[in-house]
Amino acid sequence: MLSPCPILPSAECRDTADTPADPPGRVIPINRRRRRPGDWRPERPRERLLERGPAALTDDELIALLLGTGKPGHDVFVTARALVDQFGTLHGLLEATADDFEAHPGIGPARSARLVAVTEIARRMLVEKAEERMQIDSPGAVEDCLRLKIGTRQYEVFIAVYLDARNRLIDMEEIARGSLTRMAVYPREIVRRAMKHNAAALIVAHNHPSGAVQPSAEDRRLTRVLKDALELVDVRLLDHVVVGVSDTFSFARAGWL
């Protein structure tokens, strides 16, 4: 369960280490007063992170640090809390787009780009770990890895997973990409790439940006043609996985191979 975050004034998240002292005689409202050098308090997220480590911060406090200062009229901690509430978990943020972030009044293009960059780094790290742990004899692990890799793409992507004679991973690469609804895939190119990798078996996958994972008639036709073409060069097609954001469809599991 996510921990609630105390709502602090947005001014407390501003980096003003080089800010000069207030001019004599100038009265500044307390909620606009800037922090001076050395004015560190342990309840401030940035200082607490440096003093105690990142584990001491809640999810929304970590997001608030990424956002930096709040936009005028929008407390950065309230915005961070709204993101956590909307997506439910930090993993849910991996599926968010720039438009999703900018739908929040406290987030503009710069902050949105920062969040997208961080979530993409996190997503790629998860894919790397999933590839390292992937056991080809565990369909669930394979499908999870494929979903992490292409499930959130906003356009169609076709990838191939090359395996050796013991079903160990040789490589995974993108074969083609298309638009939101259409993509050109050439079986002979997949066969050529499989032979170049000296693969004994193959798993192919593509995503449906709509999120619906039910294969189309064209998906089924392509799978039959590809399976026949690979058999001519003694390469086994183990599966064709259709990937959505949160679900997958396996041709092998459905008995369509």
Swiss-Prot record:
Q: What segments bear the compositional bias annotation Basic and acidic residues? A: 37-51
Reply yes or no: does the keyword Hydrolase apply.
yes
Q: Which GO terms describe its molecular function?
A: metal ion binding; metallopeptidase activity
Region span, Disordered = 1-53
In this chain, Zn(2+) is annotated as bound at: 206, 208, 219
Recorded hits in PROSITE patterns, A to Z, give: MPN, UPF0758
Query: What positions does the domain MPN occupy?
Result: 135-257
Family annotation (Pfam families) = RadC, UPF0758_N
What biological processes does GO assign it?
Answer: proteolysis
UniProt entry tagged with the keyword Zinc: yes
- Keywords, alphabetical: Hydrolase, Metal-binding, Metalloprotease, Protease, Zinc
* SUPFAM superfamilies named in the record: JAB1/MPN domain, RuvA domain 2-like
Motif (JAMM motif) positions are: 206-219
CDD domains with a match to the protein in the record: MPN_DUF2466
Q: What PANTHER family would the database entry show?
A: DNA REPAIR PROTEIN RADC, UPF0758 PROTEIN YEES-RELATED
Family membership: Belongs to the UPF0758 family.
This protein's name: UPF0758 protein Bcen2424_2501
Organism, scientific name: Burkholderia cenocepacia (strain HI2424)
